């Protein structure tokens, strides 16, 4: 069975603590793909009442970080967090439809 590391959050705005989070995850599992799940703008509005950076911007920044192998986006109002994991596995070709 293949393994992935999935870390999730709003990352709005991205800061040094988030980067340490990604680095630490990658250091713990250096040969395992690191997938970062970003919460949607709607999720951030529900949680904080607003968002600072749109999801497209947050994703563009996060995907350029060295420890990150893959980014996915999701909205946690339903089972979409489960779908986010599924999508990540699919993108890494670990499961097939």
Task: Please place each PLM-identified region on the residue numbering.
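Nucleotidyltransferase catalytic core that binds NTPs
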Residues: 1-95
